[in-house]
Amino acid sequence: GKKINKINELLIPGKLIEVGDATVSTGGAVANTGLAMKILGGNVSLLGKIGNDAFGGIVKGVLKKYEAKDELLISDTEATSYTVVVAAPGIDRIFLHNPGANNAFYAEDIPEEDLKDAALFHFGYPTIMRSMYLNDGDELIKMMKRVKEAGVATSMDLASVDDSSEAGKVNWRHVLERVMPYVDIFVPSVEELCYMLDKERFQEWQERAAECDVTEILDVEKDVKPLADECMKMGAKMLLLKCGVPGMYFCSASKEVLSQISERLELDVDAWAEKEYFEKSYVPERVLSGTGAGDTSIAAFLTAMTDGCTPEEALHLAAGTGASCVAAYDSLSGLKSFEELRKKIDAGWEKVK
């Protein structure tokens, strides 16, 4: 469709807007990151809570289609979480979200059996799961601590917070300070992290960006790095900050700190310690929708890490996956195998300027 510059050109009360076909797909950390890891060759088990309703049936159907091993908990009292994504050409997506059953997910919902052989536990998103952010994140800390003590490496992603909601009143800096010692690989977006650590700075970014995408006006040294440094001080072992179209920022702690990560991950500590990179995005073949680009690039990064790749290669594959994802309307159909991505990268795939 026709590109727009501002959302108020589109959403006007009383106006009828003709739109394209609806794409019904699963989303979020379990379906986007989890299924993408499976497509990219990872051995994954998917865990989440859904309602006994039509949306829950769709979720089960999608996971079945991908032959993914799922351990979905079905609630008779809660509805399946859903999101309406407004993906208009020319602007970032807008999300209308109902957390549903995700609000009632607890640490004890993770089967003990699943933790026995797992190398990595990836979790998202505490920001839109009421059980996880209440009481300064007590349940989140309990869960991450339990997983870590079971000998599993941990990674965590965030989602945007609706400032006017209950989650918007949470002291997120305090929650992050409490949970970070139990997070090995922290993979939020730079805007989400800034909102949590420094609301004033976040406000300033939005004002500076005016109607543009915030990530386009950020300076790595002045804007991104200070936030990354704070996370590392809080106890994160590795940090991958998604910075939108420009790319991703990665940094890691010392060899001594990385050696605390579970041996099941088989991480080459020498290769991964004390690194810092800004990985520019690759130019996509086309841009249809940003849906799932962050989640799937994280999936590629984590899969590459568990495959024994170097940080440089993991970042190339993550950036390549993000660029492949945006070439389709949904999160998964644009994904390419690591083999295809490596060929494309070796052939000189162009980076964004």
Regions inferred by a protein language model and the residue ranges of each:
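Glycine-rich phosphate/adenosyl-contacting loop at the front of the ribokinase-like
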Residues: 1-47, 54-65, 90, 268-275, ...
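Ribokinase/PfkB-type carbohydrate-kinase core domain
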Residues: 2, 22, 61-78, 85-284, ...
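Short glycine/serine/threonine-rich phosphate/pyrophosphate-binding segments
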Residues: 29-32, 55, 79-82, 295-298
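Short, small-residue alpha-helix embedded
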Residues: 35, 42, 194-197, 249, ...
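Structural motif
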Residues: 47-49, 73
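Amphipathic alpha-helix from the class-I
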Residues: 201, 306-307, 327
